[in-house]
């Protein structure tokens, strides 16, 4: 390392250490908050049994496995099919503050992108150095004159910590990491990127089109542009672009930006196995360059297999019967052919189109397609009638003057085609290529279709010429240039494997620039005789070059090795057992990793005889070269197909699908003359007819047997035993520069001896992009149906798991951006340590470790990576280099547009102006949107039925105001005490019996659905329920739509009696899911998806059994309906509107399509609120004194002793040294004294208010502490302030847990001075919590829950009506045998047959010709098979 580099590194370490020292005091919790005498006390604790029935079950279930999960069902072959390994590249982490403007940073990036420094980005990673601030960052909240003067300092930046020594105690690392995490803000908000159209090109901007073309296509001098035409390049797809005809070249340019992290298509398909022709049905998802398939669409983190389309060759329809549209199609890769069967012919065509586009993109380097054809190389130009409505020309061109391979390019012109063809023919009237003798030209191969661009690659032709030795014609004219293109050739399967290179992929301009320099010195070809002779002198195959000279990745520095498919990966050679070729060297097994040894061991896999392509290759060369060359030949394959953007060295690697290790490797070290233990074992597995050779082999090598057993057997045993023992391994510093291509990882020397780094194998196992960087690995158990032993991988973007047990193929891929929190808990088994990963919208995933030290290390490493991931711009969707490449391609595209405008010809008509805008994404219209998503032509009478506190009523006021703005008549039926408030907003009111304060008292004193609650409710609320049902029936008369909170209990029966559409709406989860527990049954510790799902079943059952008798009597007496039950009501099929934010409660994957998480329904009343002067003065004084201001209020909660609670709050505020706005609200509602009476004198640091609008109040404070009600929680989160929640009952525990999981606040289970004061200090000083809360607040403020809810009502209106029609058609004695029937509506939204059926069904339904039975039959069979939209699935 250079001295200046070393000094920079030391300076970085010093600055990192200095940054830690500066902030250590600020992030450490002060001593006064550490411990307290009242740590275990709770001033709000009740005297009665306050334990929920569900809590008791959860506590008793600690010895019961509630975490049984559906295991992924594998087909007969799976994902890892021997794909080549990949070279990692670096991604740049932007560490500038989230509060800073990006202008300066973008300018810096622009300068970087234009400099030559970027050429070396594949080896270096830049580290930005910026000053950190000691001040606490504040969120951008609702503007207020009281807060405008407050400074908004920047938040601290991430610094790389030095590599931890191997013997560093894990506790020290944990404490250090916790200190860093508390300091570190979390940037979940994507950075504001500059519009590409606004990026100025700071280079010297040539004005002429000729100079632009010289820059883009790297001509030596500007060439006059004769003509330019919009045209289409015809390959497997049609690519729209422009043809530029200059004096020396015919150039084609198309802007083809890549799209990262985008699901292109998803749906059900049937797939046949490798050896089993039976088709198995899977859920497929096409994302980026990978086609993944799953046994369960809700388990997207457990793929059954992956198909890497970067190695794809083609996707095509397979005709089974002539004249009929086929539903079968195939996907070919360099290794094998995959067979698929779609549900319909249009669906198959859509899949093939999508796959062809992805394969085409993946074989292009950069974000633009460039083809440069030298005119002197063109043989002829012919008309080709491929498309009837377009003029198409075929250009035959010689690739270079060494191989004389002929390529064909097809271009179609939709306008001015005749003129373009005449110009081209005149231009190539007399070229050097036409003077080359015919015997030198390579014959065209017929393997490719007529539209392929490359009929035969240069390497194939060169190989044939070297083997057959054609005579060279010295009088052939020389060709000065070669064809250059960013597109790679597509070879037939088995012809080769993907190319490999240690270089990062370059942008299109870099590719052109560097290929130009190489082409000046002529092209290089490979001499097979020389290669095979010199093979043993090198550890890797010689570099060879294919005809695509445009990509440097295919030139000098490629390392070629043969790569077998997984079926050929475990090769038992039939050569002489005594030869070194027949038996692998010692490094094949003893130098492999433990998992490779286990998978490749003959103990677990019976050896089979498999033929390898290399055998035939050797034989062919033997026939040509003679017997003398037999001992020196090695299997060499032809030119390799290139994957996407980044190439990497080829290595034999572990094939997870077949459990095998490739034995054939061209790039292996010198063939060992000595035997190995594993070679003897493998030799013993050969057929008996080779026994003579085997005996001779033993006789020759028996003298060295003792040395072999002593030296090599321990390597095998130690690695396998070490794998089963478990452990951990770090491959780099947690957030530093990857060391895969710099130096062997710590303790990983053996793993790297075969040339493949652990990071390479990791990326191959999970089909991850080449720039994915491996940080650490661990051995542990994944808790599913049974504990599944395997290996855990943590990278900079993903958390992965791979099972190691023989016979299992489970893989788990979890993006770090989907992780909400990581908790450490006790294991399910005695002596094991547990790790719980909370995932957005998914059930928790549990892991177990046999050592607590490994569990702690894994938790800290994972948390650090998750936090770093949130800092990365665009959440790591694109690396910095890819962004730079995309920007450069965009700049080239805009420059061409600008240059063309100056010489716009008559050829550019309107239909081709779309090409200027780049590649537009294809948008598929949802067929249901045009049918169901409509606004009613006439105003509707909408009634909202709810009971409870003020927080339960307020969202309905906001919804009704939105509906009134749409022209509808609204009414709210609730408790009498809210009448004035509701009518003040112009909403009609209808009374419902019941005292919310009495209900609140029972809930608080007894807990929700506890034993004492059930006792008191059954004794006191029998009459109350009867009154509630009767009053609700009267209140809901004259309604067209009923929207009800399910806690009101009567709505679903009233809607059935009135025969009107019925919707449910609630503030807490009420629908069965595995992602979250029922809001009334939140356990102390996470218990997994099975427990979560069971809580809903138990609650529904218990709740219905408690009220079913009264409800059925009421139905028969007042509603004139038959008695019912849960099976007949089908409550899980009712359309549901959840009025909380999808950013707070992420919609689970198993929610049905009629379950909508709309966002909060806020009733903003702060605009008309005038705060009292003493309150504004108090706030101003707190700001002037530099004190943090908090809000404390427990709203609609009744406590046993409000005086003790007030005293505790006062003491905590004084201890935390903050100012407090105290709102007591209903906390003393049932007490005889007035609500304004204060039990103890309040100090000047506390200001008491009775009430204030949350939208105004929370914008004035720095943190809020409250009970965790849905409405109050939503208001504090929207304000972007940290939230402290002390739950009392009901859904408050659920939202408290969500706040803690999201990292935007603190959940406390008890209130005392020690706990509450520490929570106040942490909420006002933790930069991590403050920043996360600010980012979440910005996300919530962008939502409009009321508008989303209204549109959801419109969209699901017909579905709600269909439920009423189904019930009308049932006879009295109908038992609804199919009551639990559910359909999954998933798949192809553009299926024309499906759209037609929807319209037919809609028209028949309106005309009355469709019977209810037919309606149900159609919605079952056809929709299940045709599959409509993701997530329409009954829970």
Swiss-Prot record:
Cellular component GO terms held in the UniProt record: phagophore assembly site membrane
Low complexity composition-biased segments: 123-133
Subcellular location: Cytoplasm; Preautophagosomal structure membrane
Catalytic activity: a sterol + UDP-alpha-D-glucose = a sterol 3-beta-D-glucoside + UDP + H(+); ergosterol + UDP-alpha-D-glucose = ergosteryl 3-beta-D-glucoside + UDP + H(+)
Sites where the protein binds UDP-alpha-D-glucose: 949-950, 952, 1252, 1254, 1267, 1271-1272, 1291-1292
UniProt domain GRAM: residue ranges: 211-258, 760-826
Official protein name in the record: Sterol 3-beta-glucosyltransferase
Top-level taxonomic group: Eukaryota
SMART domains in the record: GRAM, PH
Compositionally biased intervals (Polar residues): 85-99, 134-143, 539-554, 628-647, 657-671
Record InterPro entries: ATG26_PH_GRAM1, ATG26_PH_GRAM2, EryCIII-like_C, Glycosyltransferase_28, GlycoTrans_28_N, GRAM, PH-like_dom_sf, PH_domain
Membrane topology: Peripheral membrane protein
Gene Ontology molecular functions: sterol 3-beta-glucosyltransferase activity; UDP-glycosyltransferase activity
Function: Sterol glycosyltransferase responsible for the glycosylation of ergosterol to form ergosterol-glucoside.
Segments forming domain PH: 262-360
Coiled coil: none
EC number: 2.4.1.-, 2.4.1.173
Region (Disordered): 1-26, 75-107, 123-169, 185-206, 444-477, 527-594, 610-671, 727-759
Keywords, sorted A to Z: Autophagy, Cytoplasm, Glycosyltransferase, Lipid biosynthesis, Lipid metabolism, Membrane, Protein transport, Repeat, Steroid biosynthesis, Steroid metabolism, Sterol biosynthesis, Sterol metabolism, Transferase, Transport
Free-text note regarding domains: The GRAM and PH domains are required for the localization of ATG26 to the preautophagosomal structure (PAS) and are involved in autophagy.
One BP annotation, GO: autophagy
The organism's taxonomic lineage, starting at the top: Eukaryota, Fungi, Dikarya, Ascomycota, Pezizomycotina
UniProt-listed Pfam families: EryCIII-like_C, Glyco_transf_28, GRAM, PH
Transmembrane domains' residue ranges: none
Similarity comment: family membership: Belongs to the glycosyltransferase 28 family.
Listed Basic and acidic residues bias regions: 189-206, 527-537, 729-742
């Amino acid at each position: 390392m250079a001295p200046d580099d070393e000094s920079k590194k030391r300076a970085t370490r010093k600055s990192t250490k200095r940054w830690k020292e500066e902030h250590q005091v600020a992030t450490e919790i002060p001593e006064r908050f550490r411990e307290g005498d009242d740590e275990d006390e709770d001033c709000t604790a009740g005297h009665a049994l306050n334990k929920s029935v569900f809590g008791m079950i959860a506590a008793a279930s600690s010895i019961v496995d509630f975490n049984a999960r559906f295991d992924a069902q594998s087909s007969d072959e799976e994902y890892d099919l021997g794909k080549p390994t990949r070279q990692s590249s670096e991604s740049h982490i932007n560490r500038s503050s989230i509060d800073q403007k990006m202008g300066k940073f973008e300018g810096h990036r622009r300068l970087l992108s234009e400099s030559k420094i970027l050429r070396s980005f594949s080896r270096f990673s830049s580290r930005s150095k910026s000053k950190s601030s000691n001040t606490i960052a504040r969120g951008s909240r609702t503007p207020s004159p009281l807060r405008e003067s407050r400074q908004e300092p920047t938040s601290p930046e991430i610094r790389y910590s030095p590599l931890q020594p191997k013997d560093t105690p894990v506790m020290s690392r944990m404490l250090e990491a916790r200190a860093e995490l508390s300091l570190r803000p979390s940037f979940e908000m994507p950075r504001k990127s500059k519009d590409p159209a606004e990026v100025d090109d700071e280079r010297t901007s040539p004005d002429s089109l000729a100079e632009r073309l010289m820059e883009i296509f790297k001509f030596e001098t500007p060439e006059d542009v004769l003509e330019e035409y919009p045209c289409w390049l015809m390959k497997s797809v049609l690519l729209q672009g422009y043809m530029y005809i200059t004096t020396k070249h015919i150039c084609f340019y198309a802007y083809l930006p890549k799209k990262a992290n985008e699901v292109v298509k998803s749906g059900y398909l049937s797939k046949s196995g490798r050896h089993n022709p039976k088709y198995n049905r899977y859920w497929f998802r096409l994302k980026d360059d990978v086609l993944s398939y799953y046994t369960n669409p809700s388990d997207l983190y457990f793929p059954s297999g992956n198909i890497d389309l970067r190695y794809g060759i083609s996707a095509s329809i397979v005709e089974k019967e002539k004249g009929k549209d086929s539903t079968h199609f195939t996907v070919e890769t360099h290794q094998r052919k995959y067979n698929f069967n779609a549900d319909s012919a249009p669906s198959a065509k859509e899949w093939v189109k999508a796959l062809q586009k992805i394969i085409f993109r993946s074989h292009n380097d950069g974000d633009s397609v460039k083809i440069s054809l030298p005119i002197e190389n063109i043989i002829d130009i012919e008309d080709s009638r491929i498309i009837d409505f377009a003029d198409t020309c075929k250009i035959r061109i010689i690739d270079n003057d060494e191989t004389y391979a002929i390529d064909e390019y097809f271009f179609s012109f939709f306008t001015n085609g005749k003129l373009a063809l005449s110009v081209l023919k005149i231009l190539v009237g007399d070229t050097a290529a036409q003077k080359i003798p015919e015997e030198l030209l390579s014959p065209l191969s017929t393997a490719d279709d007529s539209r392929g661009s490359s009929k035969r690659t240069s390497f194939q032709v060169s190989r044939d010429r070297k083997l057959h030795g054609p005579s060279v014609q010295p009088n052939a004219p020389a060709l000065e240039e070669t064809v250059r293109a960013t597109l790679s050739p597509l070879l037939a399967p088995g012809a080769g494997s993907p190319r490999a290179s240690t270089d990062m992929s370059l942008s299109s301009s870099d590719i052109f620039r560097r290929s130009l320099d190489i082409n000046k010195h002529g092209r290089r070809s490979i001499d097979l005789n020389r290669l095979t002779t010199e093979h043993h002198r090198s550890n890797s195959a010689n570099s060879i070059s294919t005809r695509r000279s445009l990509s440097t990745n295919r030139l000098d520095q490629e390392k070629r090795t043969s790569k077998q498919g997984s079926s050929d990966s475990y090769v038992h050679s039939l050569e002489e057992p005594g030869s070194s070729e027949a038996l692998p060297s010692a490094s094949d097994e003893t130098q492999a990793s433990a998992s490779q040894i286990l998978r490749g061991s003959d103990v677990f896999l019976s050896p089979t005889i498999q033929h390898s392509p290399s055998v035939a290759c050797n034989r062919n060369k033997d026939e040509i070269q003679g017997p003398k060359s037999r001992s020196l030949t090695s299997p060499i394959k032809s030119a390799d197909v290139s994957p996407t953007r980044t190439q990497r060295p080829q290595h034999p690697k572990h094939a997870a699908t077949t459990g095998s290790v490739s034995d054939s490797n061209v790039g292996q070290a010198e063939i060992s003359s000595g035997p190995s233990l594993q070679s003897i074992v493998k030799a013993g597995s050969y057929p008996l007819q080779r026994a003579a050779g085997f005996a001779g082999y033993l006789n020759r090598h028996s003298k060295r047997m003792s040395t072999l057993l002593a030296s090599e057997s321990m390597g095998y045993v130690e690695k396998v035993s070490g794998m089963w023992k478990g452990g951990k391994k770090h491959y780099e510093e947690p957030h530093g520069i990857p060391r895969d291509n710099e130096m062997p990882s710590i303790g990983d020397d053996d793993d790297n001896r075969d040339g493949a780094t652990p990071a390479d194998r990791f990326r191959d196992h999970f089909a991850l992009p080449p720039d994915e960087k491996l940080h650490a690995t661990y051995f542990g158990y994944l808790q599913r149906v049974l504990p599944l032993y395997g290996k855990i991988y943590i990278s900079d973007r993903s958390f992965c798991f791979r099972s190691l047990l023989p016979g299992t193929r489970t893989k788990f891929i979890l993006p770090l951006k989907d992780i909400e929190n990581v908790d450490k808990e006790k294991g399910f088994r005695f002596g094991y340590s547990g790790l719980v990963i909370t995932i957005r919208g998914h059930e928790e995933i549990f892991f177990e470790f046999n050592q607590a030290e490994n569990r702690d290390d894994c938790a800290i490493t994972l948390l650090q990576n998750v936090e770093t991931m949130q800092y990365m711009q665009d959440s790591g969707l694109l690396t910095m280099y890819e962004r730079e490449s995309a920007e450069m391609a965009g700049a080239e595209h805009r420059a061409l547009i600008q240059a063309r405008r100056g010489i716009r010809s008559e050829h550019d008509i309107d239909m081709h102006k779309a090409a200027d805008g780049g590649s537009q994404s294809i948008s598929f219209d949802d067929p249901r949107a045009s049918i169901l998503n409509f606004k009613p032509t006439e105003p509707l009478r909408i009634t909202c039925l709810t009971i409870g506190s003020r927080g339960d009523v307020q969202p309905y006021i906001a919804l009704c105001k939105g509906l009134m703005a749409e022209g509808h008549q609204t009414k709210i039926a609730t408790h009498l005490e809210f009448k004035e408030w509701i009518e003040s907003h112009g909403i009609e009111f209808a009374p419902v019996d019941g005292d919310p304060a009495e209900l609140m008292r029972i809930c608080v004193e007894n807990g929700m659905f506890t034993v004492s609650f059930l006792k008191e409710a059954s004794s006191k609320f029998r009459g109350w329920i009867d009154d509630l049902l009767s009053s609700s029936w009267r209140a809901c008369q004259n309604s067209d739509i009923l929207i009800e909170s399910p806690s009101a209990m009567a709505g679903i029966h009233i809607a059935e009696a009135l025969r009107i559409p019925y919707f449910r709406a609630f503030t807490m989860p009420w629908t069965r899911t595995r992602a979250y527990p029922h809001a009334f049954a939140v356990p102390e510790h996470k218990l997994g998806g099975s427990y979560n799902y069971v809580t809903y079943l138990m609650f529904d059952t218990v709740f219905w059994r408690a009220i079913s008798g009264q409800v059925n009597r009421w139905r028969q007496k007042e509603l004139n309906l038959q008695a019912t039950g849960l099976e007949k009501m089908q409550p899980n099929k009712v359309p549901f509107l959840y009025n909380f934010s999808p950013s707070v409660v992420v919609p689970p994957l198993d929610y049905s399509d009629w379950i909508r998480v709309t966002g909060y329904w806020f009733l903003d009343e702060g605009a008309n609120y005038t705060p009292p002067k003493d309150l504004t003065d108090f706030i101003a004084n707190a700001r002037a004194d530099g004190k943090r201001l908090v809000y404390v209020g427990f709203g609609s909660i009744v406590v046993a002793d409000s005086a003790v609670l007030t005293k505790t709050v006062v003491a905590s505020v004084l201890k935390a040294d903050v100012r407090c706005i105290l709102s007591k609200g209903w906390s003393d509602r049932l007490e005889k004294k007035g609500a304004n009476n204060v039990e103890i004198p309040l100090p000047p640091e506390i200001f008491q208010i009775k009430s204030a609008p949350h939208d105004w109040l929370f914008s004035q404070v720095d943190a809020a502490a409250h009970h965790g009600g849905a409405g109050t929680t939503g208001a504090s989160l929207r304000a972007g302030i940290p939230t402290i929640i002390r739950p009392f009952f009901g859904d408050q525990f659920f939202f408290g847990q969500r706040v803690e999981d999201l990292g935007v606040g603190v959940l406390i289970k008890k209130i005392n001075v020690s706990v509450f004061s520490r929570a106040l200090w942490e909420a006002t000083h933790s930069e991590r919590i403050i920043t996360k809360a600010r980012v979440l607040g910005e996300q919530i403020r962008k939502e409009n829950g009321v508008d989303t809810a209204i549109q959801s009502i419109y969209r699901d209106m017909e579905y709600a009506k269909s439920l009423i029609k189904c019930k009308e058609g049932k006879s009295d004695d109908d038992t609804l045998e199919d009551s639990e029937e559910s359909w999954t509506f998933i798949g192809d939204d553009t299926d024309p047959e499906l759209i037609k059926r929807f319209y037919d069904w809609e028209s028949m339904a309106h005309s009355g010709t469709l019977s209810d039975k037919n309606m149900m039959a159609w919605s079952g069979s056809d929709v299940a098979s045709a599959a409509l939209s993701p997530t329409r699935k009954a829970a």
